[in-house]
């Protein structure tokens, strides 16, 4: 029987505010068994870029990562945000280690090819070093992963944190009984976006298609759910979309086959 592993993905909005970060770290610390945290950090990067006189360019909500911006996100994601989380977890007795994809070749990516938009130094994940992560986890060490990967040729790459969480979950699914939790600003996937209590408790692939056709699920939630079903297909036991403050409550939307 596989040992349980919980992978939590949190956005920058949560980890950049002291009050919400402290609550998250307390809730994360209370998770029993093996665990791993993946974080974002976009607003901090935007702020530092502005202070340095570097313009932040976004297309469809995605950051364009030119050479100067890459320096900023590497400093912020791999440094400031990541180490604040690690220090906070250590203070709560959690033996955490901060990682980017370059550390021990944890995640190697390929630079995204230019199609309609040139996103610059943005990585699409090629390989996750599951063996190394599993070795850390089984020693009781908790990986805290920044949204940065590398190309194996000496360059860092800015990489979507949702993608890192999903690909890491898939890679570890053969070794652990993995639950992947995407922390969201809502209580889960909503039947009515104007009613915060209209949470859909369970979504199957068939229901997902119906909800999209009916316009109940739309926009950025569609790729999030597509990634969730991809993780399930790759052997992840369960994917949950819920509030960051509810990761120990068993609430939210569960994605199932």
Curated annotation (Swiss-Prot):
Residue sites binding substrate per the record: 41-42, 63, 158
Q: List the disulfide bonds.
A: none
Q: What is this protein called?
A: Acetylglutamate kinase
The EC class name is transferase
Instruction: Briefly state the protein's biological role.
Output: Catalyzes the ATP-dependent phosphorylation of N-acetyl-L-glutamate.
Enzyme Commission numbers on file: 2.7.2.8
Gene Ontology BP, a term: arginine biosynthetic process via ornithine
Q: In which pathway does it act?
A: Amino-acid biosynthesis; L-arginine biosynthesis; N(2)-acetyl-L-ornithine from L-glutamate: step 2/4
Compartments in which it is found:
Cytoplasm
Give residue numbers for the site Transition state stabilizer.
Answer: 9, 224
- The answer to whether keyword Phosphoprotein applies is no
Q: Listed GO molecular functions?
A: acetylglutamate kinase activity; ATP binding
